[in-house]
Amino acid sequence: PMVVPLKHAFQTACRSNISWDCNLPDECLNLVKSWLKNLSEVGTIEFPRYCFSCERNSIKSVSLVGFADASEIAFGGVVYVRIESPNAIHANLLVSKSRVAPTKPQTIPRLELLGCLLLANLVAPVQSALSSVIDLSPNAQH
């Protein structure tokens, strides 16, 4: 979500067919200024390098959870790993991706399908990488 406004501003600038040495249109400039203001308010975002925060032998189940969404401006997907242990349930962000909606107008259902396709393309390599570390099958006993 952080880069979508910049991608949208770039797309808007490209659509306006301005020359490379001209100033940005006000709409694009306002989007960039708004993004910079919001960026300073975000603070620090930290992600753990190791997603299995509990002992491997105490893990009851591991599952991948994916979400996709779309709007008129963009669509995207995110994949989390959900780890259940006897004491707690942890969820960690693994990967996310966003895309600006195509310049040709699309319906929201079509953009939702593009988001689902993006998510499917995110899940496959994550599942492949994690399957060499831990069993992700639904009935796996850890």
Predicted regions and their residues:
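C-terminal reverse transcriptase regions that engage the nucleic-acid substrate
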Residues: P1-N57, S63
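Conserved, non-catalytic sequence blocks in retroelement Pol enzymes and Pol-derived host proteins
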Residues: S19-N30, C54-S58, F67-A70, T103-E112, ...
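Acidic, metal-ligating active-site segments
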Residues: V62, G66-A91
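Conserved pre-motif C helix in the palm subdomain of viral-like polymerases
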Residues: P1-K7, P109-N121, P125
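Flexible loop/turn segments at secondary-structure boundaries
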Residues: M2, T12-A13, E72-F75, E84-N87, ...
